[in-house]
Amino acid sequence: FDRTLAIGCMCGWDTDCNVGNISTIMGVRGGLNAINYRKFREPVNDFLACSSVIGSLNNMDIPYGALYITKLAYALAGETPPEPWKDIIDSHIDACHFEFPGSTHAMHVKTDDDALKQEGSSNIRIENSSEAAHTGARSLKFTVTSVPSGSNVYVYKKTCYCPDDFSDDRYNPCFSPFIYPGQTIHGNAFIPDYSESDAITAGLYFHDGYSGRVYYGDSVGMKKGEWASLSYSIPQMENVLIDEIGFVFTGINTLRPAFEYAGFVDDFYIDGCPDYTYDMAYSKEEKWPGLHREISQFTRLTGH
């Protein structure tokens, strides 16, 4: 796999069409074991920034994309997908279910502490794990070291992107959120016995990209070794842009000022009907490369 991609890059100097095609062929041929996880999959973190006119689909994670294509393939073949994929496809095809080995669904981790905010450092780690699962066989495990007692740990997903989120956007993506006021966030959380905390609460939250305000749902006390089902029904709202949703964990250790934090999340999804109003005066002009301009939350094609 590695050598084939290297040859494709060096011979053609075209890393999207040529190498994208041969990497697909070689990936199917060799399977996951042929792909170096640390080199290729971990940096990508399951995130695909697409460039279609459908803004909510441009923020795509690889498991969702894989099941989206799989659903179409089985429909064209007139066949029924096997379980557990049929249930996932029929219920919440875009859910963060973590059943694909190594999948992260483009989830991230951050904390309130500025010194720990840089994801990818030795202090913060996420990984797909078969150690615990709410349903199925896998979940997402997060570990944060040196967490100050009483601070928040956020395990989250970006639901909308803007130009400032990119260092290279030459393919001119455009985005609209895939969650709106009126809908409900669902998620499941688990704290293992070995997590170094005396008391932990967990809840769900969302971030308004316009005001910068964070809205929190009700938190629950976590019992180590038990899954907790969480939900947050977002009320009707006006003039907001929900660009981030996730879990918020707060842990206290009475013996240490800082400790190691470990937990799992699973079955993270959105349902319900949007209920919101929007005044275009609150919109922002997004400036992409060249002459490409978009109105925040909206996408268009040749003026439409």
Language-model features: where?
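Activation corresponds to long, low-complexity, non-globular regions
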Residues: 76-101, 257, 269-303
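Solvent-exposed, conformationally flexible loop/turn segments
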Residues: 136-137, 150, 182, 223-227
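Extracellular and analogous surface-interaction loops
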Residues: 144-146, 156-181, 233-239, 304
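Catalytic cores of secreted or luminal carbohydrate-active enzymes
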Residues: 55-150
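Extracellular ligand-binding interfaces
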Residues: 164-168, 178, 186-236, 261
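Catalytic phosphate/nucleotide-handling subdomain of diverse soluble enzymes
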Residues: 1-71, 75, 190
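Extracellular beta-strand ligand-recognition surfaces/modules
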Residues: 187, 229-268, 280, 304
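Short carbohydrate-recognition loop motifs
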Residues: 124-165, 292-304
